[in-house]
Amino acid sequence: SMISTKKLFILFFSSFLCATTSSWCKDGLQIKGKLRILKPTTLQVNDLNGTLILSCELQPNKEFATEQKLIQPDIYTLRIGKTEEKIYFENHEVNIIGYYDETNPEQSSLSFKGIDSFLTLQEYLPADKDPDTATVSLPANAQLSPNMVSALAYLANVNDYYSNKKLLDMISDDERNSLSARWLVERVKILSHQIIGAECPDF
């Protein structure tokens, strides 16, 4: 039937892409690795709008590789099976190895290579997990790219106007291209209205 041929073609095409792209281009996000899993599952990377960026079938104890794709360095959702994690990805290879338990994800043990910028961002996240009281501040010597600054704001997700405004001010207008930067622009706008509202209770 028409449907099954279409499906087969897509599966064949995506595995063919997985096999050949690495020789075409050197830049781009590519996720590779080998996971101990009990049954086949899927790896997906989505942007903050939910758009699918990369995906790959995972087979037990077999090496896998997604295609390579040029991306805007930003926060993406990495989904393995039913587990989701927000991670800052850039245009290079990321390696994942370890054990993934789809039934009890908390039993999983995965190790990542190639996410150094994401680990850097973790260092600046507030220890205070309450979004109403937490603040974010960067030391003067912090070496963060504009995309990392907006990614930090997104990951921290605090309600403090001044924290968000300070981070946004570190990103020039022409560098606010990532989805997390657009999110931060909106966030600051909304929080500024709340501040004005709080300062003018008569309105």
Regions found by a protein language model. Give the residues of each.
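N-terminal "domain-start" segment that seeds a small globular fold
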Residues: 186-203
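Short coil/turn linking the two alpha-helices of tandem helical-hairpin repeats
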Residues: 156-159
